[in-house]
From Swiss-Prot:
The lineage of its organism: Bacteria, Pseudomonadati, Thermodesulfobacteriota, Desulfuromonadia, Geobacterales. Keywords: Isoprene biosynthesis, Manganese, Metal-binding, NADP, Oxidoreductase. It comes from Geobacter sp. (strain M21). Pathway: Isoprenoid biosynthesis; isopentenyl diphosphate biosynthesis via DXP pathway; isopentenyl diphosphate from 1-deoxy-D-xylulose 5-phosphate: step 1/6. Mn(2+) binds at residues 148, 150, 219. Belongs to the DXR family. InterPro entries: DXP_reductoisomerase, DXP_reductoisomerase_C, DXP_reductoisomerase_N, DXPR_C, DXPR_C_sf, NAD(P)-bd_dom_sf. This is 1-deoxy-D-xylulose 5-phosphate reductoisomerase.
Length: 385
C-alpha cells in the first residue's frame, strides 16, 4: 500500500488524484492533504479519506476548518510550515505535488529531501529550479514521476530505449481556445474566452497558460530537466485533437507516441501505480471514431509566450524563474480584468529584458529571484505591490 500526501488536494489535479485513490482503497491511504481556499471541498475530502494531517493557507482558515469539523479531527496546520509538514510526514511514501505555480517549489523539494517519491504535477518546480531539484533527486535516490500528460507520454515512449538513441522529444499542444483567432481578435479576448478550453478541464491559471501557449513553454523547460535533453532537441507540434499526448523520435527515424482520450486520471493513475497499470476510469480510445489527427507548427507571432519560454531556456540560470514569476503576476492581472490578453506576453518580455541572468546555487536564491520577478512584473503592469 502507498501512503500519500497530496499537495493541492482541492485543485483540478488533486481532485482527480483522489478519484483514482477512491477507486483503489486497498492500494492507497491518504496521510495528509493541503489546500488553498476551498475549505468546503477540503472538509468533504477529510470526511471521506480521513487524513492524519491537513494544512491550509492561513491561521484563520485553519480555525474555520477546525470549527466546521465534527468527530475526530486531523491535525490542522497552516502556511509554508504546514505544507512542509505534510510533504515530509513520516508515514508518507509518495507525495503528489499538485500545487499551482512557484508556491509548490518549497514543499516539493522538502519532500524530495525527506526521501519521498514524488508524482510531479507542479511544472514550475523544475522550471524555476530544475538543476537543483534534479541534483536532489539523484542525491536522495528518489523517483520523480511526471503527471503532466505530455511528460507522462514522453516517459512511456522512452521506456525500454537507450537515452543515446533519442533524436528529439516532440511535445503536442492543443492550441487552446484561440487556435484559429487572429491577432486583432486576440487583442479583445476576454477571460471567459480564455477559460473555454476545447479539450481539457483544468484550473483557471493553467487554462490561461494554455491559451497563451506559455503552458507549453513551461513544459519544454520541464522536459529539459526531467529527461536530461537539450532544449534545442525539444519541439512543439500543434495537435488540436489532443489524442497523441507527445512523441519521442529516435536516431533511426522511428517515432514512439502515447495516445489516449484526454483525461488527467490516466497519467495520474500511471504515476501512482508505476510500473503497473490499473483501470483508471478513462474512456477507451476508439481510433475508428476519429475523423483524423492533424499536426502543424505553432505560430509564435500570435502566441509569443512560447518563444519567450525558449528564450528563457536558452539563457538558463535565473531567467526561467523570472519568466515564470512574471507570467504568474500577468495571468493574475488578466484574470482580475486589469490587463488584456496580449498584454500577458508583453509584460513577461519587458521583465525578461530588465533581467540579467545569474547562477542560482540554492532554493533560497531561487525564491529571491522569484520575488524580484514578481515585484518587477507588478511595476511593469502598474498593478501595485
Amino acid at each position: 500500500m502507498k501512503n500519500l500526501t497530496i499537495l493541492g488536494s482541492t485543485g483540478s489535479i488533486g481532485v482527480s488524484t483522489l478519484d483514482v485513490v477512491a477507486a483503489y482503497p486497498d492500494m492507497f491511504r491518504v496521510v495528509a492533504l493541503t489546500a488553498g481556499n476551498n475549505l468546503e471541498l477540503l472538509k468533504t475530502q477529510i470526511e471521506t479519506f480521513r487524513p492524519e494531517l491537513v494544512s491550509v493557507l492561513t491561521a484563520e482558515k485553519a480555525q474555520a476548518l477546525s470549527r466546521s469539523l465534527t468527530g475526530k479531527k486531523p491535525e490542522i496546520m497552516h502556511g509554508v510550515e504546514g505544507m512542509i509538514a505534510a510533504a515530509t510526514a513520516s508515514e508518507t511514501t509518495m507525495v503528489v505535488a499538485a500545487i499551482v505555480g512557484a508556491a509548490g517549489l518549497v514543499p516539493t523539494t522538502a519532500a524530495i529531501m525527506a526521501g519521498k517519491d514524488v508524482a510531479l504535477a507542479n511544472k514550475e518546480t523544475l522550471v524555476t529550479a530544475g538543476h537543483l531539484v534534479m541534483q536532489m533527486v539523484r542525491e536522495k535516490k528518489v523517483k520523480l514521476y511526471p503527471v503532466d500528460s505530455e511528460h507522462c507520454a514522453v516517459f512511456q515512449s522512452m521506456a525500454g530505449h537507450r537515452s543515446q538513441d533519442i533524436a528529439r522529444v516532440i511535445l503536442t499542444a492543443s492550441g487552446g481556445p484561440f487556435l484559429n483567432w487572429g491577432r486583432e481578435q486576440l487583442q479583445g479576448a476576454t477571460v471567459a474566452d480564455a477559460l473555454n478550453h476545447p479539450n481539457w478541464s483544468m484550473g483557471r491559471k493553467i487554462t490561461v497558460d494554455s491559451a497563451t501557449m506559455m503552458n507549453k513553454g513551461l513544459e519544454v523547460i520541464e522536459a529539459r530537466w526531467l529527461f536530461d535533453i537539450p532544449v534545442q532537441r525539444i519541439a512543439v507540434n500543434i495537435h488540436p485533437q489532443s489524442i497523441i499526448h507527445s512523441m519521442v523520435e529516435y536516431v533511426d527515424g522511428s517515432v514512439m507516441a502515447q495516445l489516449g482520450t484526454p483525461d488527467m486520471k490516466g497519467p495520474i493513475a500511471y504515476a501512482l501505480t508505476y510500473p503497473g497499470r490499473v483501470p483508471s476510469g478513462v474512456k477507451a480510445l476508439d481510433l475508428t471514431a476519429l475523423s483524423g489527427l492533424t499536426f502543424f507548427k505553432p505560430d509564435t507571432d500570435r502566441f509569443p509566450a512560447l518563444k519567450l519560454a525558449y528564450r528563457a531556456a536558452d539563457a538558463g540560470e535565473s531567467m526561467p524563474a523570472v519568466m515564470n514569476a512574471a507570467n504568474e503576476i500577468a495571468v493574475e492581472a488578466f484574470l482580475a480584468g486589469r490587463i488584456g490578453f496580449m498584454a500577458i506576453a508583453e509584460a513577461i518580455e519587458k521583465v525578461m529584458d530588465l533581467h540579467e541572468p545569474h547562477a542560482l546555487a540554492s532554493i533560497e536564491e531561487v525564491l529571491e529571484t522569484d520575488r524580484w520577478g514578481r515585484r518587477t512584473a507588478k511595476e511593469v503592469l502598474g498593478v501595485g505591490c
